Amino acid sequence: MSSPQPPNVPRSETAALPADLAALRAADLPVHGGRTMAYVYDAGIAGLDELAAGAHAAFAGVNGLDMTVFPSVVTLENEVVGRAAALLGGGERTAGTFTSGGTESCLLAVLTAREHAHRTRGVRRPEIVLPVTAHAAFHKAAHLFGLTVVTVPVHPRTFRVAASDLAAALTDDTALAVVSAPSYAHGVIDPVAEVAAAAATRGVLCHVDACIGGWYLGHRRLAADIPPPPAFDLAVPGVTSLSVDLHKYGYTPKGASVLLFRDAELRRHGWFAHASWPGYPVVNTTLQGTKSAGPLAAAWAVLREVGTAGYTELSRRVHLATRQLIEGIGRIEGLRVLGAPDASLVAVASDDPDLDPFVVADEMRSRGWYLQPQPAFAGSPPNLHLTVTAAVAAPERIAELLAELGAATIRARALGPTGVDPAVVALAAALDPDTLGPHEVAAALELAGVSADGALPARMAPVLAVLQALPPRLTERLLPELLGRLYALS
């Protein structure tokens, strides 16, 4: 008997699809080459993308929802999590979970802490204590899971929290203390050991957010000829969980992070199980249900390919390039590095009132470099964020970047700073974000330089200047409206 033939399903013309996708990508910033100094991470290793893409494609249809049907998911995840645990101070009792990214890892850390505080200490009104420099993902987690955020100021020059200040903010209702290794905005490592010890004294969990730098820092300390970073991982007494993204300095495709716990019992508090319905029994280790195993397989393949020796050398190069960059910025008139970065993230501010860092960013973008603007907040002046990755970690590439940056400052100084009409600031200060209607929102966006269709101008300095002048709560009200204009069907 012949095999049944598949039905003749009508298909659209496929020949043009690759060209259509390429046309869409043409408007994006490049993801290779190191010129996009935020959001993307490039190892600069030939063939690595193709290896990852092949692994991703092989497992794209595998559903991580049910590991009894797809046991390969268990093997892959255990090996990836085990690799992270071995690097970052894990021991025999360490457990972990593979997640879709840093935000999900942070969300799960907070959820786990909330459940742990409720079940073990009877906490009904949980709080999360963190430095003002902690990542926004923790504020998102507190919003979603009903925790009160207690922020602690940082030193105005080092941008590092004082352990005594954070310890003083801990109460009987604290479910979680958070420290960064490093902080995203300034690249500094908080006093992990001191904060973890203070938290342990009160029976409070302590999470280390090493999402952006953990993989780099862990391998950097394996390099023999460069200084190791301060202690920051699970080997530090009192640290109960740690998040590390593989799609950052692990250079894997997007959608790969690991959340480590001191033990499996703590991890269990963040899992969800449900059998009180007529369908299949559900157990979720992450916030997702159905999830493709593609990102997991791609991460597994890249970690195997690069290996410990490869990552150690990449981290060594990134460290040396970062030091070269910091020293070079110190020689550019009008620019200064904020704090003393412990990792590969550098925040560059202006000490010249005639030099606007946001105008510098526009000038750099016109030359093919993206430096991420960071508005002034809580004592941190307006600045530009630079993430140094392996693709730009060569002396000649850093020299090229410094030359472009020096030239951009000259042009930006000639253009002058972007001003904001004081009347606009006064008007904004009088607005109540909670009562703004559609017309007021539209007017506020127009004041910020955003058109009715959500299109942004080529030069963003004027928009950033206005947003920086607005109260943060008003900005938080306007940003979703802006996205609503962009993500619209008509």
Where are the language model's segments positioned?
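Short Gly/Ser/Thr- and Asp/Glu-enriched loop/turn motifs at secondary-structure junctions
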Residues: 92-93, 339-345, 377-383
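Short glycine/serine- and small hydrophobic-enriched flexible loop segments
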Residues: 86, 111-115, 300-305
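Short loop-beta-helix segment that forms the pyridoxal 5′-phosphate
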Residues: 84-108
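Conserved PLP-enzyme active-site core in the AAT-like
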Residues: 47, 100-285
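Alpha-helical scaffolding segments of alpha/beta enzyme cores, especially the outer helices
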Residues: 194-197, 201, 324, 359, ...
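Active-site nucleophile and cofactor-binding loops and adjacent substrate-binding regions
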Residues: 69-73, 96-103, 130-131, 376
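Active-site C-terminal subdomain of aminotransferase-like
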Residues: 227-344, 348-353
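Non-catalytic terminal extensions of PLP-dependent enzymes
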Residues: 1-34, 38-67, 71-74, 78, ...
